[in-house]
Curated annotation (Swiss-Prot):
Keywords: Biomineralization, Chitin-binding, Repeat, Secreted
Protein's organism: Procambarus clarkii
Protein name as annotated: Gastrolith matrix protein
Location, primary (coarse class): secreted
Keyword Plastid in record: no
Other facts noted in the record for this chain: The gastrolith is a unique 'organ' that absorbs the calcium in the outer shell, allowing the shell to soften and break when it is necessary to shed it. The crayfish then re-absorbs the calcium from the 'gastrolith' and the shell becomes hard again.
Residue spans of the Sequence repeats: 11-15, 16-20, 21-25, 30-34, 35-39, 50-54, 55-59, 65-69, 70-74
Role of this protein: Associates with chitin and plays a role in calcification.
Superkingdom, taxonomy of origin: Eukaryota
Amino acid sequence: SPAALQSSSFGSAGFGSTNFGSSGFGPSLGSTGFGSAGFASPGFGSPSLGSAAFGSSSFGSPSLGSTGFGSSSFGSTSGLPYLVVIPNNPAVGGLR
C-alpha cells in the first residue's frame, strides 16, 4: 500500500537513513545530500545537493547547491554546471 511504501521502502528505513543513507549514499537525499560516506566526502565532495553531496573534491565548487557541481573541474560559480576540459586534472581524467 502507499503507506507501506512511504514509511518502509522509500522513507526512513529504505531509501532514507538506512539503505540510501548513512553508510551508502548519505543520511537520505534530504539531510546530507547524496553523500556522506558512499557518494560524497572523498570521491565527489562537499556541500551541494544536501550538505555533503556532489562537489568539491572531484567535481568542484559553488554551482548547483552550495559547493556543488561546478568550478574546479566541471563548471562555474554561477548556476548550472558547464563542461570545462582542464588538462592535467586527474580528477576528471585530464590529459597528461
